[in-house]
Structures are given as C-alpha cells and as structure tokens.
Amino acid sequence: LTADPEINVARVVSRVSDGGHDVPAEKIRSRYDKALALVKELIAVCDVCHIYDNSLSAPYRIFKKRKERCWYCTQRRLWHKEDIAALTGIKNAERAALNQKK
C-alpha cells in the first residue's frame, strides 16, 4: 500500500507517459479506499501477514502478524502507531525493527 492515493495517481501518470495504460484518477482513489477498508478483514483470516508501504522507491514493512502476535514499525514517520492501529484494527501490536537486514 501507499501512504496516500495521490502517489498511485502519480505513478499511473508516469506509466502512461511511458506508453502504459491509463486508469482514471477517481477510479484509483476509490479503489484505494476500498482496499484499505478490507485490510482488517484480511488480517483477521491470516495466520501470517506482512504489510508493506510502497510510497517510496523501496518497499518498507510497517506491520507483521504471526499467529496471535503482532508487530509494527514506525521508523519512516509516514506511519504512526495510531495509523497502523486504525488500518489493522490491532491496538496491542509491539514495536519492532521490522526492516533490518539479517
């Protein structure tokens, strides 16, 4: 996901300038909101779930669920604990460094 639907709109504009297909901006915005609304349901039915922010050039994991345990990472400042809780419906996630190379 991205932190803002306007990022997705800009990416489609860029794709079109490279010869790719277009998607109306309003369609992108409505799909963005619909997709975010489904995140809570998705997490509820998954034993393992990772959510990545693709707002910048490299994906960045902001949430991880494994069985009944959940973690969040807010190192990028685009996402705060409250934002992740609102997105996922999980308020008791633990803070962790989810993006360190092993």
Listing of model-derived features with the role each one plays in the protein:
Residues 37-41:
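A charged, well-structured terminal subsegment
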Residues 1-36:
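A glycine- and Lys/Arg-enriched "phosphate-lid" helix/loop adjacent to the NTP-binding pocket
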Residues 42-102:
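NTP-dependent small-molecule kinase module
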